[in-house]
């Protein structure tokens, strides 16, 4: 994974429907058909409808950050 603060290119996607933010086991369904599940225990609530997300992934694991949220969370791809 990349270091914070460095200018990097991330994949930009959009969550399908609404989300309430982060929590262990939360599933993020993207408009591109992919589904990712949060594997870290970070907990942050922010209800949003179809927010943009940044993805930093390698294969079926990586990190995700929802627009307007503070942190990146660890994820695994389940679909």
Q: Model regions: which residues?
A:
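Short peripheral tails and domain-boundary helices/loops at the edges of structured domains
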Residues: 67-79
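Short nucleic-acid-contacting surface segments enriched for D/E, G, S/T with interspersed K/R
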Residues: 41-56
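Short, isolated positions in well-ordered beta-strands
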Residues: 35-36, 71
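Short capping micro-motif at the N-terminus of alpha-helices
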Residues: 38-39, 75
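Structural detector for short beta-strands of small beta-barrel domains
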Residues: 5-22
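Short, basic/aromatic beta-hairpin or loop at an interaction surface
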Residues: 19-35
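Short, Lys/Arg- and Gly-enriched loop/turn segments at beta-strand edges
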Residues: 60-68
